[in-house]
Structure formats: C-alpha cells, structure tokens
Curated annotation (Swiss-Prot):
GO terms for molecular function: ATP binding; pantetheine-phosphate adenylyltransferase activity. It holds the Pfam family CTP_transf_like. It catalyses: (R)-4'-phosphopantetheine + ATP + H(+) = 3'-dephospho-CoA + diphosphate. This is Phosphopantetheine adenylyltransferase. Keywords: ATP-binding, Coenzyme A biosynthesis, Cytoplasm, Magnesium, Nucleotide-binding, Nucleotidyltransferase, Transferase. ATP binds at residues 10-11, 18, 90-92, 100, 125-131. One of its GO terms (cellular component) is cytoplasm. It is an enzyme of class 2 (transferase). Its EC number is 2.7.7.3. Gene3D superfamilies: HUPs. It comes from Prosthecochloris aestuarii (strain DSM 271 / SK 413). The keyword Nucleotide-binding applies. The lineage of its organism: Bacteria, Pseudomonadati, Chlorobiota, Chlorobiia, Chlorobiales.
C-alpha cells in the first residue's frame, strides 16, 4: 500500500528550507503531495499558479511527488480525500512547534486517521522564512543561497532586480 503524505504551506516563495523538508519526507513516504494553501487572508507576492509552476519545476524529478492547490476547506478533510496518512510540517524553532502542535491536535480531532510528522530542516535553513526572503529580495539583497535558481529568477522578475546587483 502506498504511503501518502501531504506537505501543506503557502510557499510564497518555496525556499531551500521547504525543499529540504520535502526531500526528508520523500525519504520516508512513497508519495508526497505539496499542497499550496490558498489563503485569502495572506497578501502573497506570487499567485497560486506561479507558486505551483515554480514548485513543480523543483520537485518534478522526485518519484511520487506532485503539487496541488487547496482552494478552500479543511486540511484534515483534504488528507482524507487523497488518502494521506500523514501531514508533514517543517519545524525550525520552538515558536513553530507550539503553533504546529496545536494544529496537529486539531487535525487529529478532525481526522483521526492522519498523523502529523514534524521534520526539522538542515540547521543552515533554520532561520530561512519566505517572508524574510521576500523582504531581502525586495531590498536588492542576494538570496541565491536560500532559494532554487528558478525561484530566484522569478523573484528578480517581480522586483526588477538584475542578478548580482541591488536595486539601489
């Protein structure tokens, strides 16, 4: 039986920290579905379609990997719908864990068949967050160590920044 996990997030943008957690999950589960949460309360830089395209280019070479969008509804219900037995969450610090632990308990109540699996990224990504990447890129900083080249290109397009040059 195929063990399916879902890896949800906004992924605006998908960072090397996200990729690291995805790769770790891929070593545990037969199939990992990256689920882009469309959250109308968040003001995102990239559209859902842009995020999907970027992530598909990055994870497309992994067996059992796919990208889907959760437009509305509960993650616990989505997990049931796709037959996922696990929800993968990356945890960088204690603050992340506190929030994710609460969400894990809620998801368990809503869907007792799904388990949340907490994975820590490589230590070099523990301070990397999409919001920080967006801000540094917007200010012309070099983020090439924190995102895939295809994401870097899209950030440059969004912020009209030439590679290796700041916008000042």
């Amino acid at each position: 039986m195929t063990q399916i996990a879902i890896y949800p997030g906004t992924f605006d943008p998908f960072t090397n920290g996200h990729l690291d957690v995805f790769e770790r999950a891929s070593n545990i589960f037969d199939s990992v579905v990256v689920v882009i949460a469309e959250n109308s309360r968040k003001n995102t830089l990239f559209s859902v379609d842009e995020r999907r395209e970027m992530i598909e280019k990055i994870i497309g070479r992994y067996p059992g990997a796919r990208v889907e969008v959760l437009h509305d509804g509960l993650l616990a219900d989505y997990a049931r719908q796709v037959g996922a037995k696990a929800i993968v969450r990356g945890v960088r610090q204690v603050k992340d864990f506190e929030y994710e632990f609460q969400m894990s308990l809620l998801n368990r109540q809503l869907n007792p068949d799904v388990t949340t699996v907490f994975l820590m990224p490589n230590v070099k990504y523990t301070y990397v967050a999409s919001s920080i990447i967006r801000e540094v890129a917007m200010l012309g900083g070099d983020v090439h160590n924190f995102v895939h080249p295809n994401v870097l290109e899209k950030l440059h397009e969004k912020y009209n920044v030439c590679k290796g040059q700041s916008n000042t």
